[in-house]
Amino acid sequence: MNFKRISFAEQCGQNSAQRQAEVQRVLSLAQASGLEWTRLVWCDVHGSLRGKTWVTSELASAFADGMGMVSTLMLKDTSDRTVYKVFEADVKNELPGFEGASNVMLLPDPATFKILPWAEKTGWLLCQPWF
């Protein structure tokens, strides 16, 4: 049997020809610009940007399979404290998908790519969270 591996982007319906072309454009630009780091960011419930920094050589992997993170990073207040007690029984009813500090996947949007002029050899991408 020959099984085709399905990427996370494909599973989420986020692998159109247009997105694939954008991904290739970003990967080429990142390589040509000598970027070493890429900040993958998302917006929290307060409108603040939070993020993780990846080595740019792994960016193709992030575009295809996303980046995992613990869901409690989305449940912080403005002083960076986790607001919900995710290990208590009733949180499953209040916040489905967050119980037990489950994982969330972040999928970068290639259309948001920027090279940061104030951070040497660093790119930036906005990500969409997927539960």
Regions inferred by a protein language model and the residue ranges of each:
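ATP/Mg2+-dependent ligation/transfer catalytic cores
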Residues: 1-131
